[in-house]
Regions:
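Intrinsic disorder at enzyme termini
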Residues: 1-11
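N-terminal glycine-rich anion-binding loops that anchor highly charged ligand groups
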Residues: 15-25, 48-52
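C-terminal helix-coil-helix/basic helical segment that borders enzyme active sites and/or dimer interfaces
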Residues: 28-36
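Internal helix-loop-helix
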Residues: 50-118, 158-165
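A short, Trp-centered hydrophobic/proline-enriched beta-strand micro-motif
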Residues: 117-125, 169
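Active-site-adjacent elements of ketosynthase-type condensing enzymes
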Residues: 129-137
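A structural signal for short hydrophobic beta-strand segments in well-ordered beta-sheet cores
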Residues: 139-142
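A short core secondary-structure module
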Residues: 151-181
Length: 181
């Protein structure tokens, strides 16, 4: 299999790399010191990335993304892995894959505002006894009437302090199975 990029693919990757060097890297020291991206910088990066055609590069085509092939997407992710993740999120990269599973009212409430940059999410998976091992999760979600009641402890939730909503993982089954509760 030939992994060489076409001229167009390489041009996209090179221009994205130049954009990151020009627009993201200069803010890294400040973001590291503050431990967050100030709103004015976030808005500026978002505006400039949209103008340059780089906003939402990881989005599927049906949700406004460029519909990159896998090889180009891999190279885009390689380039975007170099600057601070917090700064990369400013380019509309904070749309967690699970949001694309939204249905009905969830699309208008969570997915579309996240794509537009109006709402930010955090992902709560890690627990004291379950790092990234989803099968070790003990936080429970139980139905009470028409509501879900969550009982458990989560930790190390990146961006929880600035998120508009949190996507939380929990077990909801009552019976132990070979795949967990």
């Amino acid at each position: 299999m030939d992994f060489a990029l076409s001229f167009e693919q390489q041009a996209l990757v090179d221009s994205l790399e130049a954009f990151c060097k020009r627009e993201l890297y200069p803010h890294e020291a400040l973001v590291e010191e503050l431990r967050y991206v100030p709103d004015d910088i976030r808005r500026e990066i978002r505006r400039k990335s949209a103008e340059a055609g780089f906003e939402g590069m990881n989005l599927p085509e049906e949700w406004g993304g460029p519909g990159l092939d896998k090889q180009t997407k891999m190279q885009v992710e390689r380039v975007m892995g170099k600057p601070s993740a917090a700064l990369g999120q400013c380019m509309n990269r904070g749309v967690t894959g699970i949001l694309f599973k939204c249905r009905g009212e969830q699309i208008a409430e969570y997915l579309l505002p996240s794509i537009r940059g109006e709402r930010r999410n955090a992902f709560a998976l890690t627990e004291p006894g379950a790092g990234s091992d989803a099968r070790a999760i003990v936080t429970k979600a139980e139905r009470e009437g028409g509501d879900w009641v969550i009982n458990g402890v989560k930790q190390f939730i990146s961006a929880a302090d600035i998120a508009d909503f949190i996507i939380l993982t929990a077990v909801s089954g009552v019976d132990q199975t070979d795949k967990g509760p």
